[in-house]
């Protein structure tokens, strides 16, 4: 195919999800494109779901990855914001229509023509491959400026996990100093939700089924309180005390007990994605004027705002850096929940033979 450039990534070729070196092509650098050498890529749980086709729409070979930080190696002649050598980020999506109401209002995430960092179809009909690769080519609009004082690799998961928790806090008004926020789940999303909430000046209660996480939540992450959700005495005392709750848990679980923790007008925002329907007592919500909301990652403008906010307040993820030769072991550990709190792949230093 004309105007394609060879590169190398790590792809799954079937639903086993096993990742191996894979040579493929990306488009040549267009006039509005930024080409970057990938330095680091975060490992999101959705990557694991997708390489195993657990969502049902994976096409193989599949190069996953949507939390990418790299260094600019080439720019198109119409690119204005970046030059060769800049550190930049790439997140969950890499293109949108640019014209719909969502795009005009800087919430490209909800554009009906959104193109994801992998598994979407590019303009030339090829399948877009993700950040577990040596290079990427992205339109300038969807590339993020990376602050010099934001550490690598620990900042990398902000592009996915960070945006996922920051965006609903801003949209639903859960960013006002003095508010009381509950955070359900203390994983990759939850630990960043605690950090952002504390930077906003919120009182934070971590809600978990695991009593063993109390010390970590309070003494390491800075939460103000810890609630064991299976402890009836604790939950009784916490009823009607929270202005909002960010629920980061993807495993199916009951939501109604969480609503009891909210004050009247409180908001339960679900950012995890359970794969089973949930039951709601609508009358209970009506009587307390309580809201169930959802959210995905922020748009381009908001994600850049989040990155800059994180740099200003020293917010990064707690990460374990993984060499690419150990990527499949990392995926096995992720499936077991054996990570604190996020894996980041060291792609820049990887050597690969195809």
From Swiss-Prot:
Disulfide bonds: none annotated. GO terms for molecular function: oxidoreductase activity, acting on the CH-OH group of donors, NAD or NADP as acceptor; zinc ion binding. It catalyses: 3,17-didehydrostemmadenine + NADPH + H2O = (16S)-deshydroxymethyl-stemmadenine + formate + NADP(+); 3,17-didehydrostemmadenine + NADPH + H2O = (16R)-deshydroxymethyl-stemmadenine + formate + NADP(+); 17-dehydrostemmadenine + NADP(+) = 3,17-didehydrostemmadenine + NADPH. Expressed in leaf epidermis. Binds 2 Zn(2+) ions per subunit. NAD(+) binds at residues 45-49, 185-190, 214, 271-273, 295-297, 340. InterPro entries: ADH-like_C, ADH-like_N, ADH_Zn_CS, CAD-like, GroES-like_sf, NAD(P)-bd_dom_sf, PKS_ER. Component of iboga and aspidosperma monoterpenoid indole alkaloids (MIAs, e.g. tabersonine and catharanthine) biosynthesis pathway from 19E-geissoschizine. Catalyzes the first oxidation step of the unstable intermediate product resulting from the reaction triggered by the geissoschizine oxidase (GO) in the stemmadenine biosynthesis process from 19E-geissoschizine. Its EC number is 1.5.1.56. This is Protein REDOX 1. Pathway: Alkaloid biosynthesis. Zn(2+) 1 binds at residues 44, 66. Keywords: Alkaloid metabolism, Metal-binding, NAD, Oxidoreductase, Zinc. Belongs to the zinc-containing alcohol dehydrogenase family. Disruption phenotype: Reduced accumulation of catharanthine and vindoline, but accumulation of akuammicine and short-lived MIA. The gene is Redox1. One of its GO terms (biological process) is alkaloid metabolic process. Zn(2+) 2 binds at residues 97, 100, 103, 111. Its cofactor is Zn(2+).
């Amino acid at each position: 195919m004309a105007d394609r450039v060879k590169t190398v990534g790590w792809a799954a070729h079937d639903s086993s999800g096993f990742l191996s070196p894979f040579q493929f092509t990306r488009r040549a650098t267009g006039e509005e494109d930024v080409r970057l050498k990938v330095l680091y890529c975060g490992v999101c749980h959705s990557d694991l779901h997708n390489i195993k086709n657990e969502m049902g729409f994976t096409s193989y070979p599949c190069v996953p990855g949507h939390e990418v930080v790299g260094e600019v190696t080439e720019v198109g002649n119409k690119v204005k914001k970046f030059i060769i050598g800049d550190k930049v980020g790439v997140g969950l999506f890499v293109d949108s229509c640019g014209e719909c109401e969502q795009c005009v209002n800087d919430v490209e995430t909800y554009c009906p023509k959104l193109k994801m960092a992998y598994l979407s179809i590019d303009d030339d009909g090829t399948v877009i491959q993700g950040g577990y690769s040596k290079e990427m080519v992205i339109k300038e609009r969807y590339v993020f400026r990376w602050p010099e004082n934001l550490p690598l690799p620990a900042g990398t998961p902000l592009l996915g996990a960070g945006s996922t928790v920051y965006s609903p806090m801003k949209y639903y008004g859960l960013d006002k100093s003095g508010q009381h926020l509950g955070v359900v789940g203390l994983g990759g999303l939850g630990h960043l939700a605690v950090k952002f909430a504390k930077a906003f000046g919120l009182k934070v209660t971590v809600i978990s089924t695991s009593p063993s996480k109390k010390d970590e939540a309070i003494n390491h992450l800075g939460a103000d309180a810890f609630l064991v959700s299976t402890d009836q005495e604790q939950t009784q005392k916490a009823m009607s005390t929270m202005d909002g709750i960010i629920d980061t848990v993807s495993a199916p679980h009951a939501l109604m007990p969480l609503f009891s923790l909210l004050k009247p007008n409180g908001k339960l925002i679900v950012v995890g994605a359970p794969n089973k329907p949930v039951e709601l007592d609508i009358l209970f919500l009506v009587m307390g004027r309580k809201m169930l909301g959802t959210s995905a990652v922020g748009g381009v403008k908001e994600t850049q705002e989040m990155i800059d906010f994180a740099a200003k307040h020293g917010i990064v993820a707690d990460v374990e850096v993984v060499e690419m030769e150990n990527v499949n072991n990392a995926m096995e550990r992720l499936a077991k929940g054996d990570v604190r709190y996020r894996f980041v792949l060291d792609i820049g230093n990887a050597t690969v033979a195809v």
